[in-house]
Amino acid sequence: MSNPALQVYGGDEINAIVIDPGSFVTNIGYSGTDCPQSIMPSSYGNVETDGDTKRIFNEQPLLFPRAGMEIKPIVENSTIVDWDRAQEQWEYALNTDLKFESNKGTPVLLTEPIWNSEASRKKSLEILLESMEFEACYLAANSSAVSFAMGRPTCLVVDIGHDVSTVSPVIDGMTLSKSSTRNYVAGKYLNHLIAKNLKPREIVPIFQVLKKKPDFVKRTLSFDVNESVINFANERQFFQEFKETLLHIAPKSLSSFKDELATQTKRSLEAPWGEELIFDADTRYSFAEQLFRPVKEDFPEGWPASTDGIVKTWHNDYVPLKRTKPGTSTNTKEKENTAESTPVPASTEQEAVDSPSQEPNENGKRPVENKEDSSNNEQNSNEIKNEDANSNESSAKATVPSNGIQAKGEDEVAGIVDLINKSMMEADVDLRATLAHNVVLTGGTSKIPGLSDRIMHELNKSLPALKFRMLSSGHLRERQYQGWLGGSILASLGTFHQLWVGREEYEEVGPERLLKDRFR
């Protein structure tokens, strides 16, 4: 298959590749199509026999144990942790599933989480443009891609995936990093809760079952099976079926839903080892309830239990305007990304020299000015104020946070609705009504029945002044690759092709300049 050279970025006849690496699966395919041509697990099998190393990327071979095989992750918490294997997996998918002969002349769009580090983004550009020799590339935020897939350029994306749950406001297709929130209560955590409930039972994967009726007989293998292979098989088979079959979310908190639970019937699931697992309604509803009210004591040792839900990002949404000093040259091309690119007015230039603490920091913001001369006056005026008014004001501040939402304790982990509330309050007040009217629910774990109605109920109770509307894809399977679908739509737009970053531009200005000027 020959690939036409990428000569004009404004043309419409450009076949781009879209890569969407997630925590559970990695989706790869052509732009302009409605589903990815390659869906592979975000893990690989490393088989070492007699000094030789073989790597397996397809899911079905990974479910069959081999001597000396260990399964290792490529993506964790939506971030690529093994770049060498990621490149090898992408090349395998392009050659095997997409029948791609050469990357030259073809652009590629890569989705990434909003909290992706600067080092990881530099590595992305290096792999795509240098190692894999794509003609051009673009890095798109997952939440921005989801907004394009739903046709909502301004929305609030609630992504409940395998490792991470994320809430991100998207304004005109751009994700606001400083208003994004996340926690680590998602599908993987539900797997842990299910396994904890089933103890002391041993969860036996299908490949270890020789016979399950009338009596269970475990298969004996001639080699030792690595623990990672057993965990991978259970995660892809038993836990997935369990969550899709038995889990349900109550329309309101379980404490106020007890009477309705008493009328619910029990449900059962046949385990791979032949046992019929029977669960009452209270147990089935309690698993997914932790998406809303996580219990910190249930977290396994070493689990990243963030209590604030704040996303730490290396970049800033705030971009200072570039102004020119009076009497200086208007050509600021050579001074971009320097202190001179945002000069102060001539009247205050001497003041800036006298006050070195007023220099902009790395985020482009200036520190708060410390005025010692005016502090005495302010102190005197504060003493004159009525003491009763001060006491009332201080008590009000102690009980009600500034955003108007009931504060959680220091040791309480934020649930999904807490993340939405925090993200909404961090956004501009003029945008909140639009965001509330376009709440997009996506991610593999969002397929649990009752999730959308419960989020709507909790939001109407916590923020009654706003009118909320939940949006989600009617195809449940599509929610697992909705980020890829948005990237496919984005890369196929004729007006988007001017945003491609070519290899020549990368070699000319370098990755640091590109990340600051083109991929903020």
From Swiss-Prot:
GO terms for cellular component: nucleus. Keywords: Activator, Chromatin regulator, DNA damage, DNA repair, Nucleus, Transcription, Transcription regulation. It is found in: Nucleus. Residues 339-361, 389-405 have a biased composition (Polar residues). Belongs to the actin family. ARP4 subfamily. SUPFAM superfamilies: Actin-like ATPase domain. Residues 362-374 have a biased composition (Basic and acidic residues). GO terms for biological process: chromatin organization; DNA repair. This is Actin-related protein 4. Component of the NuA4 histone acetyltransferase complex, of the INO80 chromatin remodeling complex, and of the SWR1 chromatin remodeling complex. Residues 320-406 are annotated as: Disordered. Pfam families: Actin. Its main location: nucleus. Chromatin interaction component of the NuA4 histone acetyltransferase complex which is involved in transcriptional activation of selected genes principally by acetylation of nucleosomal histone H4 and H2A. The NuA4 complex is also involved in DNA repair. Is required for NuA4 complex integrity. Component of the SWR1 complex which mediates the ATP-dependent exchange of histone H2A for the H2A variant HZT1 leading to transcriptional regulation of selected genes by chromatin remodeling. Component of the INO80 complex which remodels chromatin by shifting nucleosomes and is involved in DNA repair. It comes from Kluyveromyces lactis (strain ATCC 8585 / CBS 2359 / DSM 70799 / NBRC 1267 / NRRL Y-1140 / WM37) (Yeast).
